[in-house]
């Protein structure tokens, strides 16, 4: 049921060699041109506004040039609004989910980004490093603080006993709702297994809360007779991915402690596609992807699991992954091959690492409680803030109000563009004249 542990020698070797890819490249924030879906119609107007519609006529994307605003309507009913501001910051909001204000800044001549998230009245910060991969500008997560080497070693290696832990969310509405999909391990052989359940449960709770806020949570489904859809085998693959990420963060922490900067090419998805091993991604936000067999949309949501198949080609802006688990008929089916943009994959990895770091915070703070083992003395030191986090621009004091206002502005923005779309029919391409016949010598 539980994965074999990666040998200690590999952990030490990987820590020493982790940042040798040499792939780093900076990226200034710029508005990406979204790829056009092969089955969608795209109507671009004279003033730069545009509307993209699905094959059934429903709007998927609206771009308002004068407002510098993009609105995306997901298949599952979610709406994401992104606004770009003159100072190169951006605001991103999603119905019922955490929104953020992102501001760029420079540290040691490199591009960094500070996101201030607002969720259920809480304010928290995350940090990112700019990086180009296959010509796509990515924002790669970098922790705002690192633990001691002793803590990462403890988090990586197994416990000396099986730990039975009772989660506080048993009986909560979200857990009842997703009982058909997820069940925690019956016991834990080490921190990475506990963190696996922490990551999945955190993502599912966020999805449920967003559904309740939008009035679209749906009825609870019965647990299948053969067990939850998220199988132990798939969870074990995620467990192994979490071990890799603990390994990764330990290497980053060593560089930070020595006054060096990490390489975003080693910390982001470039590293994942550089080796020959399959890797798994956890979907961290609602996402529409392309079913490669049908070229139609299908939806993914928090807690769905994807696996890499092959690395993208040098000119590819998306990668092919296989769906290992999803939540029923409204989403991409299990074993479906889907095309996912590199930017979306990087955001999935960012979400996993952010949630993983949050889980490590809880492990350290709750050591010795509810069955969790006590930490060794070498693992009890508080995380040390990074130099780049200390120099980040402060949170926007008006950001909470701006996030709320953006949802209202998006309503007006969409209305402006769709009204113009109706008044300005798309001009069909000019008919080409048939080529003159070629005179051949007699």
Predicted features by range, described:
Residues 304-333:
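SH3/SH3-like beta-barrel superfamily modules
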Residues 276, 301-304:
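Residue-level recognition of short, solvent-exposed, well-ordered loop/turn junctions
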Residues 325-347:
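Surface-exposed edge beta-strands and adjoining flexible/disordered loops or tails in beta-rich
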Residues 32, 36-42, 46, 52-236:
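Low-complexity segments
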Residues 59, 282-283, 305-310:
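A structural signal for short, hydrophobic beta-strand segments that form beta-sheets
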Residues 1-101, 377-442:
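Extracytoplasmic low-complexity, disordered linker/stalk tracts in cell-surface/secreted proteins
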Residues 235-288, 311-313, 317, 334-336, ...:
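SH3-family beta-barrel domains
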Residues 291-302, 310:
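SH3/SH3-like (including bacterial SH3b) beta-barrel domains
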């Amino acid at each position: 049921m539980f994965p074999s542990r990666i040998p200690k020698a590999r952990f030490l070797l990987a820590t020493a060699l982790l940042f040798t890819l040499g792939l780093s490249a900076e990226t200034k924030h710029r508005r990406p041109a979204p790829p056009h879906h092969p089955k969608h119609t795209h109507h671009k107007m004279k003033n730069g506004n545009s509307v993209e519609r699905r094959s059934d006529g429903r709007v998927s994307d609206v771009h308002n040039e004068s407002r510098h605003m993009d609105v995306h309507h997901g298949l599952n009913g979610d709406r994401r609004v992104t606004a770009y501001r003159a100072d190169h910051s951006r605001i991103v909001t999603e119905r019922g989910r955490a929104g953020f204000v992102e501001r760029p800044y420079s540290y040691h001549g490199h591009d960094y980004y500070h996101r201030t998230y607002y969720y259920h009245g809480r304010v928290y910060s995350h940090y990112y490093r700019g990086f180009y991969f296959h010509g796509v500008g990515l924002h790669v997560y970098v922790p705002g603080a690192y633990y001691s080497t002793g803590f990462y070693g403890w988090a990586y290696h197994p416990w000396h006993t099986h730990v039975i832990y009772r989660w506080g969310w048993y009986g909560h509405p979200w857990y009842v709702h997703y009982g058909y999909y997820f069940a925690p391990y019956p016991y834990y052989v080490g921190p990475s297994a506990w963190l696996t359940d922490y990551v999945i449960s955190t993502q599912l709770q966020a999805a449920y809360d967003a559904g309740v806020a939008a009035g679209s949570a749906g009825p609870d489904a019965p647990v299948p007779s053969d067990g939850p859809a998220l199988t132990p085998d798939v969870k074990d693959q995620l467990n192994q991915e979490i071990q890799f990420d603990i390994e990764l963060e330990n290497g980053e922490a060593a560089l930070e402690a020595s006054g060096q900067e990490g390489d975003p090419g080693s910390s982001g998805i470039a590293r994942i596609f550089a080796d020959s091993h399959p890797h798994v991604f956890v979907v961290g936000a609602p996402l529409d992807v392309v079913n490669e067999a049908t070229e139609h949309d299908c939806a993914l949501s928090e807690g769905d699991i994807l696996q890499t198949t092959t690395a993208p080609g040098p000119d590819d802006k998306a990668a092919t992954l296989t769906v290992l688990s999803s939540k029923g008929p409204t989403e991409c089916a299990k074993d479906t091959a889907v095309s996912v943009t590199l930017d979306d994959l990087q955001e999935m990895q960012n979400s996993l690492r952010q949630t993983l770091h949050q889980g490590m915070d809880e492990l350290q703070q709750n050591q010795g409680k509810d069955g969790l083992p006590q930490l060794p003395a070498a693992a009890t030191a508080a995380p040390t803030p990074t130099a780049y986090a200390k120099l980040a621009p402060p949170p926007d004091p008006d950001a909470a109000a701006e996030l709320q206002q953006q949802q209202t502005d998006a309503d007006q923005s969409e209305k402006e563009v769709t009204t113009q779309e109706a008044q300005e029919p798309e001009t069909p391409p000019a008919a080409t004249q048939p080529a003159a016949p070629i005179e051949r010598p007699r």
